[in-house]
């Protein structure tokens, strides 16, 4: 199983030189957030691998315009080939920006603990809790 994890800054190697061959053999792409919508949609042209994503704290525009061809797993457990992946986007609140995906520590804990399904992988936007 080959998983490509991407986050925050678009890879110049993928953005400028992406081909089907370059992504060949990758089974799943996980986006940890804060990537432009256009970048994620661009990658869908070069792979048949599912692209799962969570919201980053700078993805406020996603509230009105989600990336096409990708699967948002925020606050869900997504099962892929038996692997249970929990999406936990956003970050710990650091300002009052209402458009950002920010949560208090209590809210984050509740998001993780309220998920009754078991999970093996957390797809997360911030450093470990």
Label for each model-derived stretch:
Residues 47-51:
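A short helix->loop->beta-strand "cap" motif at the edges of active sites that frequently abuts
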Residues 5-13, 55-129:
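Conserved catalytic scaffold of divalent metal-dependent phosphoesterases
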Residues 30, 52-54:
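A short beta-strand/loop micro-motif in the catalytic core of glycosyltransferases
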């Amino acid at each position: 199983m080959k998983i490509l994890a991407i986050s925050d800054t678009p890879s110049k190697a993928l953005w400028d030189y992406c081909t089907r061959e370059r992504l060949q053999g990758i089974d799943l792409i996980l986006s940890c957030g804060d990537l432009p919508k256009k970048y994620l949609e661009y990658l869908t042209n070069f792979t048949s691998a599912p692209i799962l994503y969570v919201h980053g704290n700078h993805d406020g525009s996603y509230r009105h315009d989600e990336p096409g061809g990708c699967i948002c797993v925020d606050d869900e457990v997504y099962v892929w080939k038996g692997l249970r992946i929990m999406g936990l986007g956003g970050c710990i609140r650091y300002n009052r920006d209402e458009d950002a995906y920010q949560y208090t520590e209590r809210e984050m804990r509740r998001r993780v603990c309220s998920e009754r399904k078991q999970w093996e992988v957390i797809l997360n936007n911030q450093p470990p809790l």
